[in-house]
Each structure stands twice: as C-alpha cells, then as structure tokens.
Amino acid sequence: MESMEIKQELKRTWGPFFSRFGCFTQIQEITIPHILNKENVVVISPAATGKTEAVIAPIIENLLKGELKGLKVLYITPTRALVNDLFRRLEEPITSLNLTIGRKTGDHPVIEKKHLPNVLLTTPESFDSLLSREPMIFMNLFAVVLDEIHLLDNTPRGDQLRILLNRLRKILQKINSNLQYCALSATIDDLKIGDRYFDNSKVCFLKSPREIEYILIPAKNFIKEIFKIAQVRQIKKILAFFNARSFAESFSQKFRIPPFEDRVFVHHASLPRSKREEVEKFMNQSDRAILLATSTLELGIDIGDVDAIILYRPPYNISSLLQRIGRGNRRTDKLFAIGVYANNWEKILFETFFDCARIGELYEKRYQASLSVIPQQIYSYLYQRRRIGTTLKSIYQIFQSLYPEAIIKDVFKKLLSEGIIKEMRPGIYYLTDKIENKIAYGKIHSNIAEKSFGEYDVYEISSGVLIGRIFYLLEKFILGGKCWQKVQVLEKEKKVYARCIGEGPEFSKIFEGKGAGNYNYLLSTILKNRFFPTLLPEEIPFFYDGKNTHIFHLFGSLYGFIIAESLFEEGIDATDIEGKILMLQNFQMPDDRFPIPKLTSIKKVIANNIARFEDALGSGAFFYDLPNELQIEDHILNLDIPGFLEFIGCLKLREIDARDFTGTLRLISVEKKD
C-alpha cells in the first residue's frame, strides 16, 4: 500500500495523529496496512520511529467504524512513567475524535465503572488487579496493545502477562470475541516473540537505519573531557546513564559547571512522581541541560531531542545499551554516545557491545518460563473467583502452553498444605485469609521483587577505599589482583569490608576494577576473540604452570562461580577469578575437553546459594512460595543450565605458553602510550 493510499484509508485519524509530521515513517508504512486489515502484529523498530502512532491510529480508525460503548482498547506498558507519558501524548488526538482515554496505575488507582474510557493505559500489575476485581469491564474489548514488550519478555512480569492474556481470553470465549493484538519493541533478538502472547502474529520489522558513532574515555577526569567534547561538537542537551542511582546523585554536583550550572537534573525511580514529571517537562522544553538517569529512562519517556548520550560504565547487556543510545539524536540518522570506562576490561566490554549493537546481535538469554509466577497467578485467579471458587482443572487452563500440569500441581499442593488454599466443597477451592494483607495492599498482583543483581561493593577495612565489586561473596575471594578475606558484611547496603591477605595469581592483576559480569555466556566467544583472534570459536586458551591449570573462559561471574563451585563439590580445588579465568589448583587436564561439572553438582551449588541467585536473577516476588525443589529448578531454567552445559561441551582447550598468555592479556589491558 502506497503512502497516499494509507493516508486515504486513515480518513479520521490522519489529522490528529500524523498531520503535524507531514508524512509517515518507514515503519508506519510497513505496519498500518496490516493493522487496518485486522491482523495481529509485532512491530520491531528503533526508538523514535513512530511505533505508537503506527499501531494506535489504525486501531482507532477501525474502531470508529463500529460500536463505541465501553472499554475498547487496552494498552499495556511496563511502567507507570510510560503510562503517564503516553497519556500526555495521546490525550489530545484521541479526545479530538470524541473518544475518551484513561489510565490505571498505582498513581491513578481509580477508574469509573459507569464511565469506562474507550482507551485504557495501564501496567501488567494494574491489569492483573482489574482482571481479578472487575473482569466484566473487558467484555466489549476490541484490541490489546503490548508496549515495549522486550522489557517484559523472558521475565516473571512477561510470563504474568502471558497468563493474564489467557485469563482474558477465557472470559471472552463465551461471546466469541475476536481480539486484535499488537506488540511493540525497540530491540529484539527473537522474531517469534509475539507467538508467546497471541496467535498468528505478523512481524513488521525495521532494522536500525541509524549509524552508531561512539567515543570511549577513561573515568579519570571524565567530566572535564565530556565538556571538551560538548564544546567541539556544540552539544547542548545530554542524557547520562548510570547503573546505580547513587552514582547519578553523587555526580550531579560535579556536572554543575558552566555552561550548565543550574540545568543539571537527576531522574530515577526513587524520586517522587511529581519531581520526575517536573524534570521530564523541563528537559522537554529546555534547549540546554544535562540529565543524569538510571535505567528508568531507557524507556520511551518524552524528554525532547538529546544531542549526546553518556554511558557511565557498560550496561548489563547489549539490549540495554541499544535502548540507552536510542534515546539520543532523534532528528538525525546517527546515534552518538560517549562511553566512560573504569578499566581496560570495561573498555573491551564497551567495544564488544557497540560492535554487536551495530550488526543487531544482542546475545539475549534463551526464553524459559518463570516458575515463580505460578503461585502468584494461582492467588490472583482464586481472588478473581473468590465468590464461587474454582477447580484445579480451571487453574491448569490459565497456565496453558506455559507449564506442565505436574509442576502446577506440585505448587498447588504446597499452598494447600500450608493453608493458603482450602477446599470448601469437593474439588472447589478458595483462598484463605492467610494472605489477606497482600490482597488488601494489592501485593498479589505484582511479581516485582527488590533486587540488586547480587552485587556487593567491596571496601578495604582500614582505609574505607572502594576496591571493586563482586557478584558472589565467599569467605575468601580474589579481586583486583589480590586475595581478600571477608571481615564485615552490610547486607542491606550490599557492602563488604575486607582485609587483604596476599597477592593473587600473577595474571589476575591485569583484571583490576569493577568489570560487569551478568552478560549471556554466549558472548564469551566474541570477547575471547578480542584477546586471541587466531583461535577458532570453539577453542579456549589455557596454560599449565607445572602445578595449576589456568583456563581463560570469560563466561562472566554468574557462570564462572557455578563452574568453580560445582567442580569444588567434585573434589577439584577450583577458583573463579572475576568471571574470566578458572584456576584448577594442583590439577592437570587429562585431555582437551573443558572440565564440565555434573548437573547434580550444579544443583547442589544452587541449592546452597538459593538466596544469592534469587537476588542476582530477579526471580520474582513469589519465588519462595515455590516448593524447594522447584526453587532450584527455576534457577536452573533462568540460568539456562542445559544450554550452558551444551555450549561448554562443544569447547576445546588449546594450550598456550604461559608467557604468551599473560603477555597477550597485559598488552590488551594496558593503554597504549603515544
């Protein structure tokens, strides 16, 4: 369908949604005809390409041809901030068509049943609450839109949404409702993502046409360097991302120098809503400002055009990097970012992430349904059926296509034995008052759990100087090339005070600093190639010093810890060094196969570290409502242990001279002098 023909088809909605732009974007031209044809679509396109209008305008165009009574369009987006931002953007065009728009979030908890909006913006948690408390308001529904689906998918919240859609379909099946579904995403590795949420999805895919330009600078005096770059490039508006809100807050004062002074702001989830919205509004209207933010602004919140993106330290994965840099330079075909690295390892991570982002290789973890959602959805569904109760068969149906019945039954039996569920009549079950507080405060509708990714900041006990960061806290550990012994742990603050007890292995000194370690294990092959470009993808370098074996794996801290601890369970004195090197003490490899621990050993390590992994993996608010064996299984699935074991089973060890090994690593990790 040509652009002019699309415009003619949008008789009512062209003016309100597109006239101020004058033309359609490429993704809009691809998508709109399919939605007008009432197909289910997945729209994959970079930030700021007009995905929202590409979906909502043709849905409303079709909607205006029929009955407009009641709630017609359910628009689900990951956060309250996005709901508020979308409301600001969509209120005027929608109301100009004599339709109504509303929002349902924790900030806006009430909607009038007698005056339902035609379009409702909400979050998965508020959708859960509405479905449990007022299911009949959805009886006239016409379309469902899932916004920023990549931020939910492959998480407990994404699986919660899948089950909620099953429950919605279960309600509507009596009236043979034929809902239209649309999902939107800025970055996706898996083009079949839509199939998890609805049937017959048509993918409308636009690869990033925007060139990525970046500059990497060391953290020392980085603010001074950034201001130099800003002056040369005439940069006026900057968005800086930090991996922790404490960094964003602490650096805000240091940025308050000419020409920005009082135009430096901070934005993160802990700020009051009114303050966040005030900052967003100022950034949108200002022609010169700096905003220091956390991952909350990875989302499509409107803060106007930004000239440059600063990334202070590498983000957790490539998808996050793409989201962040996509917030800048919206009026040009080029993305410009400045990466600030604390050490050479972080510089290598930055280079690798940017290279992968340029070719669209995201290395996301393989999809696995989260088991911790099962108890949450049992509670929510039983609350929906609180007046008449429900059967176990009906509960199986809402989990259709996600979990085997045997697993659901195991969870159900645990909740029954603990008195959270009771059988009032033969085969008819109800919730008891054991979780009445969670019901009263709406907690049964949320899978969001506090998480810190399992990281601890490590401080030297006598000086209080920050040494670095580790993922898993052992009694003794290696960090920054030295051996440390734990002295004091402040669990709430995720701080560890430690005492140096000696030098670490010689080669570990090159890995000083706070490298990130929560990336997918598949990325290790790409990272290794930067150090040893002549090795085959399946080859892993190692050397034997006559006593110990040192294997350079780069799997990251999560998997490095699992391998070392599991081998230790099997009698091998194994140590992981910062997720990069596996040291086998007093051990020589018998052949060229990578040392693979048994699955039983891995399960034992996970069982002994349930809480640490739960914190690191963000396993969901109801994780501990699972039976113990399913807690272990949930971690196994979340970590994709079967895939990981298959991956390392294909690796071959390649012996390298110790001097070449350490020399190569030092050469790469030390900055070259001009």
Residue ranges of model-derived segments:
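Terminal, basic amphipathic appendages of nucleotide-handling enzymes
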Residues: 334, 370, 441-445, 453, ...
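C-terminal accessory/connector segments of nucleic-acid motor ATPases
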Residues: 364-483, 488, 549-551
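SF2 helicase motor core recognition
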Residues: 291-309, 327-330
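Conserved segment of the helicase C-terminal RecA-like domain
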Residues: 287, 317-365
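ASCE RecA-like P-loop NTPase motor cores
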Residues: 149-150, 177, 319, 347-348, ...
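Phosphate-interacting basic helix/loop segments used at nucleotide- and nucleic-acid interfaces
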Residues: 124, 225, 278, 283-286, ...
